[in-house]
Amino acid sequence: MTTIVSVRRHGKVVMGGDGQVSLGNTVMKGNAKKVRRLYHGQVLAGFAGATADAFTLFERFEGQLEKHQGHLVRAAVELAKEWRTDRSLSRLEAMLAVANKDASLIITGNGDVVEPEHGLIAMGSGGGYAQAAASALLKKTDLSAREIVETALGIAGDICVFTNHNQTIEEQDLAE
């Protein structure tokens, strides 16, 4: 699995993920890039789950973004519908976190499109650890969104055996 964290704070949205790819109990790769920019750099997207499945979902989601002129919520809802009803897609085992200047969303294969509270997304095998860390930092510090994402991923990497410390982090100004 993996850990993906996204935080909205102080006029920025930041998304980060670790780089570990595991097959069973073996680490196959340590520098995978699980967070990227989509739709002309306007959307941040990260995945947790099977890598090949995630790439399929990235392609489908980017197609929905193009179809709906970059409208994040509409594209997410349409992908979730397609994912739930298309026989080949329904077998995919991954989750997507997506964010732009307007919203942060989690998209699942069950057809769920969830906008989490407080602008915080944490998912994957280390998601619980990262969420606890990021929540505490959001409540008790004035750290930047990037610092919170970096710290939360680091804590998840210390605890979760399926998460490493090789971080990919993308950030976007909310004014863009």
Swiss-Prot record:
It is an enzyme of class 3 (hydrolase). InterPro entries: ATP-dep_Prtase_HsIV_su, Ntn_hydrolases_N, Proteasome_sua/b, Proteasome_suB-type. Na(+) binds at G157, C160, T163. One of its GO terms (molecular function) is threonine-type endopeptidase activity. Pfam families: Proteasome. One of its GO terms (cellular component) is proteasome core complex. Transmembrane segments: none annotated. Its EC number is 3.4.25.2. NCBIfam families: ATP_dep_HslV, PRK05456.1. Belongs to the peptidase T1B family. HslV subfamily. A double ring-shaped homohexamer of HslV is capped on each side by a ring-shaped HslU homohexamer. The assembly of the HslU/HslV complex is dependent on binding of ATP. HAMAP family: HslV. This is ATP-dependent protease subunit HslV. It comes from Pseudomonas fluorescens (strain SBW25). The gene is hslV.
